[in-house]
């Protein structure tokens, strides 16, 4: 059960973290930690991000080729292997500057969950359905997720705890939004009908 919850948290809740994440800059950031092969980057990506944003080996190598082309990384050596040659890459000064700029550029907060709930609420009101019931059902779903995440944090490693905290804070914001919206349903109903 604990493993399933961990996989659930990593898969579902990190989607908000990496949904808009650029693979190119993320791989460049991973490579900034030190020179490495495409295989090393893929392993690092899989460890941190694959549950919510899988990346195929082909994407890794295609991205590395673009990074070389753009002057953000350089190939520093080639090692013979059992299969294809293993190319080792290193970030250039321009690449480091790109990573620094990327790290200092704030990510636009995603409102996807609220937008979906809002759309359902408006449509429910348009159809004279019970929008309050819809919000109650959504609130119950959010509360169930909060309980799962809270349990998960008890035995989780630091990565799991941090991801669970991130998800919990987003869920809390969603719940506040639902409460505010529920309190304004009559007002919204009038606006929808006008």
Where are these regions (language model features)?
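Amphipathic alpha-helical dimerization/coiled-coil segments
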Residues: 100-147
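Long, compositionally biased intrinsically disordered regions
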Residues: 1-18, 158-160, 176, 183, ...
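Heptad-repeat amphipathic alpha-helical coiled-coil interaction surface used
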Residues: 132, 139, 143-146, 153, ...
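Secondary-structure edge/capping motif, primarily at the C-terminal ends of alpha-helices
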Residues: 125, 149-156, 185, 189
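Basic helix-turn-helix/winged-helix DNA-binding cores
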Residues: 6-111
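Amphipathic, well-ordered alpha-helical segments in soluble domains
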Residues: 37, 41, 63, 69, ...
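Alpha-helical scaffold segments that form or flank carboxylate-/histidine-based iron centers
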Residues: 56-59, 87, 159-170
